[in-house]
């Protein structure tokens, strides 16, 4: 086998980051997401995004090529997050409907439109189509935060722990004084 790993494969073999995710510089949300599993942003504007999700073999849930609906949901959720396009935002709820199954090799185009731009809680309507046939529709609730959700969560846990500790100390003091 004569395989030269240093041989120049040519530019047609090279996938540049801007080809994989042309909006990577404008997109504030989900910088480390695997676009091969969640789709790529095709259009990005104020309170709206369009993404393309390609259903691959690794997403199949059976031998017939049915894509597990969790992958489709994840791709729709990513489209919603892209429409909001805030660094510290997280999906807190969704109401969704699947209208048709997705199979290996299909492309689902998601169109996401966000409302309530001035609010911390945004509502995003997402429609997914395959060959102009609606296969998905959902409304996502996205909350925009001041900091990363884990930092806020940690601060809240620490605050609750301090309150419990003060309550225990107060109860012990009252017990000793009785």
What are these regions (language model features)?
Residues 19-27, 31-34, 107-109:
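Short Pro/Gly-enriched beta-strand edge/turn motifs at strand-loop
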Residues 63-73, 77, 81, 93:
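Compact, glycine-rich, soluble single-domain proteins
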Residues 35-37, 47-49, 90-94, 106-108, ...:
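A generic structural signal for short beta-strands and their flanking turns/coil linkers
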Residues 42-44, 113-117:
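Short beta-strand micro-motifs enriched in acidic
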Residues 51, 94-98, 112, 126, ...:
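A structural signal for short, well-ordered beta-strand segments
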Residues 78-109, 114:
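Hydrophobic beta-strand-centered segment that forms part of the acyl-chain substrate-binding groove
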Residues 29-67:
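Catalytic strand-loop segment that frames the active site of acyl-thioester-processing enzymes
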Residues 1-20, 88, 103-104, 115-178:
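HotDog/MaoC-like acyl-thioester-processing domains
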